[in-house]
């Protein structure tokens, strides 16, 4: 579900803004899109989705945009959902170039992987997302 559609209280709005700021800390040239899907995508209520667009194709990160999906568990007892995992996809329309998921081995796969420094920064983004209070792990 689009990050912009997931804001139901101040705490979630703060965590969504913090997620965007955290990503841009490591990739300052990226612009954030809080609504990467054309529709509300109601069937994907177990994710909070962002897209980060670069000013052109980046040979260092091997993509033009990154789709960031936070897999969440909504618990009515908590105002902020629990983070279950993170999926990032490096994209060049119309195809995926690489993917990393924090579920399992945290292994990056794909046909065109980012350079080592950018790859390390992507993993740092994931680690720091787990540190946000959005996460109850």
Predicted regions and their residues:
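Short acidic, glycine/tyrosine-flanked loop/strand segments centered on an H-E-D-like triad
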Residues: 89-112
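Conserved small/polar residues in nucleotide/adenosyl-binding loops
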Residues: 135-137
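Well-ordered alpha/beta subsegment
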Residues: 106-128
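Amphipathic, interaction-prone secondary-structure segments
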Residues: 30-85
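Low-complexity, flexible helical/coil segments
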Residues: 67, 84-90, 120-128
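Charge-rich, low-complexity N-terminal segments
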Residues: 1-51
């Amino acid at each position: 579900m689009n990050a912009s559609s997931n804001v139901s209280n101040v705490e979630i709005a703060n965590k969504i803004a913090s997620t965007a700021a955290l990503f841009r800390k490591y990739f300052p040239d990226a612009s954030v899109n809080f609504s990467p899907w054309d529709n509300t995508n109601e069937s994907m209520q177990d994710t909070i989705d962002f897209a980060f667009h670069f000013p052109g194709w980046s040979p260092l990160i091997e993509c033009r945009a990154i789709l960031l999906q936070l897999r969440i568990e909504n618990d009515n007892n908590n105002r902020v959902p629990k983070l279950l995992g993170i999926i990032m996809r490096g994209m060049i329309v119309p195809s995926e170039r690489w993917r990393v998921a924090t579920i399992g081995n945290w292994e990056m796969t794909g046909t065109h992987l980012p350079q080592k420094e950018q790859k390390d920064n992507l993993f740092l983004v994931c680690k720091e997302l787990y540190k946000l209070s959005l996460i109850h792990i």
